[in-house]
């Protein structure tokens, strides 16, 4: 006795007849899909990022990403330019000379057990070509010293921001034009990754960040990431929304989701190999002048919400920057 299945009309059909009909439909669908794919061009700008990279290059990028994203460790940002670090030296009575900057970096890099807590260090280009004069590492460039210690050396390759005309003071970063040449020099000096920062402010009254501001900055980050991987460096992309303003936490979540969604789509559209890239983003917070107070748990949940909505699981790790917050607040919100 043949079995029967209930059809959508309530009548019955023999199972074998249904299977034959479904098989014909499946074969027709497969032919249509093959025909559609035959007319499409899936080049390096498809969603299969990294098609232009060799398997060896991909493996190298992933390996560096895994080292940087090691559990229980963090990235130290030592990429202040001479002017910025000079103000800090002067605050403690030191003259801002290249030798004092070098000695300060050496003290940080060669501190006992630094590699237990740090996975990577972001350097200013000046620091790449400075040498240690310690007994253990005498004469070695700082990138080599860091590598020997077990800390991955990287570099800040971007230049300065300039204002986007007609965008209420919103900015975009300079440095893409000469990026490939400089990145090759930095790699030759011992760097394994680079970090590009795109700063933005939330200014609800002036409509910032506008679509133009977001798209301009995120497209630059995507192109930077593509160039990095072509040279052989892991790109860390840093969309940095500042704490300026009086916006609430809900507004911060909405805008950060939009920014990161535009960023990750741009990276895919550019053909960036997502497994060989890392995110370094601001911690999602209300504006410093917000009239409403939020708990640590509410802010932590807001950050998780942003990741749940847009973070690509192909990426090995996401890293927070703590700028604008006290160490105690940043640690509590991260924990």
Predicted regions mapped to residue ranges:
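A glycine-rich phosphate/pyrophosphate-binding beta-strand-loop-alpha-helix module
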Residues: 188-210
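Active-site acidic/histidine proton-transfer and metal-coordination neighborhood
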Residues: 212-236, 240, 244-254
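Conserved, mostly hydrophobic/aromatic
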Residues: 97, 196, 237, 279
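Conserved radical SAM core fold
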Residues: 128-129, 160-164, 199-207, 242-246, ...
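Structured alpha-helical segments in the cores of large, soluble enzyme domains
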Residues: 176-193, 217-233, 259-270, 300-310, ...
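N-terminal chloroplast transit peptides
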Residues: 1-22
